[in-house]
Amino acid sequence: MTQSIKLSTDQMRMMSLFQNVTGAVARDCIEDEKQDRVIFVVNTGKMGLAIGKGGMHIKSLQNMVKRNVELVEYDEDPAKFLSNLLNNKLISEVKINTRADGTKQAIVMVDPRKKGIVVGREGRNAEKARLLAKRYFDIGSVLINSPERATMEL
């Protein structure tokens, strides 16, 4: 992590509610007004506890906050973190490069037939990846690429 993350009182309240409902500690909370969702980052190995049996914890949390709730499993390795973010079953490789100007760039390789799923409706998954990559690892851009198609830069 390049810098300390500052949380608002609303975000801290949301994290406290998350912990009370799920029993898992949220590492971070991002409120995405544009997509009407709340994204919680949980520590490695705590996804099952956070989700609950049959998604029970997430459903009750969504009912309480009246928004979609999304979870991401944190990892110290930026490539693994991005893979967790964008559905690691659909990703073949993640490369982190440093450009000549010193900024970092992530290149995510996916099967061309699955690219739409990885990017998400209206680019919501790609936007989440860009936001969290910047927040945790100071990665300026995330490229979702497939071997046979053109690169999509975010």
Question: Where on the chain are the PLM-derived regions?
Answer:
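RNA-contacting regions in translation and RNA-metabolism proteins
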Residues: M1-L154
